A protein has these predicted regions:
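A generic structural signal for short, solvent-exposed coil/turn residues
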Residues: 1-3, 23-25, 67-69, 108, ...
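Polyanionic/metal-chelating signatures
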Residues: 87, 92-169
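Glycine-centered flexibility motif
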Residues: 1, 7, 20, 34, ...
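Generic, ordered loop/turn and secondary-structure boundary motif
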Residues: 4-5, 72, 76, 82, ...
């Protein structure tokens, strides 16, 4: 968008309701002087592993990859999200207001991703973005080759050995 200097921004219930040069705040509104500062919209993290790979790492809550097979499209990252991951607090401090949490990249098809609002919640259901579609994670390259291919890895003799094998599935 365009740069606006000496403008005003009116928020109501966490949403922008007015933006411009001559906005009057309603009676009782809190005023914040942001002179010399930047105001930006919330950042959308389109590729996140927060909650499935906690930050800092906690082994008991690391649910990013289901490596029982190269294709695990049936698993859902929302079932592995740890809503109390301290990384969510750091992310909101950096401006990330919503994110797509994806499974890891070990598998060709790693499972469903989920769209979350970065809000404090005891459950992942309390963080889900209303009516957002589910997504599907695919990784075609080094990670699936490392985990399943080269005649070694976790599944000796397994595929894929190459990107061609990745695509062939």
């Amino acid at each position: 968008g365009n740069l606006m200097e000496d403008g005003s921004l009116l928020l109501q219930d966490g949403k922008i309701v007015a933006l411009g040069a001559d906005i009057e705040a309603p009676d009782g509104a809190e005023t914040i002087d942001a002179t010399g500062r930047w105001v930006t919209p919330g950042i959308i993290d389109n590729h996140s592993h927060l909650g499935v790979y906690p930050s800092p790492g906690v082994t008991a809550h690391g649910d990013g990859n289901e490596i029982s097979a190269p294709v695990t499209a049936e698993v859902w990252s929302e079932h592995g999200v740890w809503p109390q991951d301290p990384g969510f607090t750091r992310a909101i401090a950096g401006g990330i207001t919503s994110l797509q949490v994806l499974p890891g990249s070990a598998n060709l098809f790693g499972g469903r991703g989920v769209i979350l609002k970065n809000v404090p919640s005891r459950t992942v259901q309390g963080m889900k973005f209303p009516d957002a579609p589910y997504t599907l994670k695919m990784a075609c390259g080094e990670n699936p080759k490392r985990v399943y291919g080269y005649g070694g890895g976790r599944f000796p003799g397994g595929a894929p050995y190459s990107r061609m094998g990745n695509v062939a599935g």
